[in-house]
């Protein structure tokens, strides 16, 4: 879902053009043909929350949300704040957190991944409302080694989603899976792209990751070899009870 955005050719924008962050009397700049909704406005906060609420009412079996946000704030002006434009960035973020707090309170058992043009919102305040975040849209496994190594200096493995994708097909599925297994393992790849052997390996790898899940998610991390010091990298995870590594 991407409830913070609005398309100019939409019923929402036609009814509430003043709900968008948009500078008056200037040419409007559209990023990805979108505008950002003004979350400093309590009515907009109610609307954004209602997006989640309506989805859950219509689809109570929903088991996972990816909360996306792919546009920076452009056309900087809040119709709601009027002569308090200096508060826009602060009040906008507070408004987002107000929405997320309501979502978390009402749907505490639904896992939610935070994505914002990749990893633009990876911070501990946002993590209060999400179970995990998307470190980067770059899923090349070689480059992900460095990305995940860096993120792991500040965040635990359980907070970072890492997926096997079709990026860099020159690398094996095993290598891509090994890299993604450093964090919360997932697969964003068409099964038809995999050979029978690759599919069988992937199923085994998922089962093995689940076997070690407690050690990876909640154990202690040991940095054995830095990717910045040679042509390979190694991490070790040990469970709190030291029974798994």
Predicted regions and their residues:
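Short, Gly/Pro- and small/polar-rich lid/capping loops
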Residues: 104, 222-226, 236
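Phosphate/diphosphate-binding loops
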Residues: 1-3, 44
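Short, solvent-exposed beta-strand-terminating loops
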Residues: 6-9
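Glycine-rich, Lys/Arg-enriched anion-binding loops that position phosphate/diphosphate groups
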Residues: 205-231
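Conserved structural scaffold segments of CAZyme catalytic domains across common CAZy folds
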Residues: 201, 216, 242-243
């Amino acid at each position: 879902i991407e409830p913070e955005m609005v398309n100019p050719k939409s019923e929402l924008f036609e009814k509430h053009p003043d709900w968008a962050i948009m500078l008056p009397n200037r040419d409007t700049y559209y990023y990805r043909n979108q505008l950002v909704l003004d979350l400093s406005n309590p009515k907009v906060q109610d609307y954004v929350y209602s997006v989640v609420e309506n989805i859950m009412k219509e689809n109570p079996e929903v088991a996972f949300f990816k909360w996306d946000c792919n546009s920076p704030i452009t056309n900087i002006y809040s119709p709601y704040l009027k002569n308090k434009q200096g508060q826009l960035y602060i009040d906008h973020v507070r408004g987002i957190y107000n929405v997320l707090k309501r979502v978390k309170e009402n749907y505490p058992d639904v896992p939610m991944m935070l994505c914002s043009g990749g990893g633009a919102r990876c911070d501990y305040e946002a993590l209060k409302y999400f179970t995990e975040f998307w470190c980067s849209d770059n899923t090349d496994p070689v480059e992900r080694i460095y990305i995940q190594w860096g993120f792991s200096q500040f965040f635990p493995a359980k907070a970072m989603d890492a997926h096997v994708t079709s990026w860099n097909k020159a690398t094996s599925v095993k290598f891509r899976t090994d890299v993604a297994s450093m964090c919360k393992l997932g697969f964003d790849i068409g099964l038809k792209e995999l050979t029978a052997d690759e599919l069988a390996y992937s199923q085994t790898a998922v089962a093995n990751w689940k076997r070690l899940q407690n050690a990876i998610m909640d154990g202690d991390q040991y940095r054995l070899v830095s990717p910045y010091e040679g042509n390979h990298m190694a991490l070790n995870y040990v469970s709190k009870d030291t029974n798994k590594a």
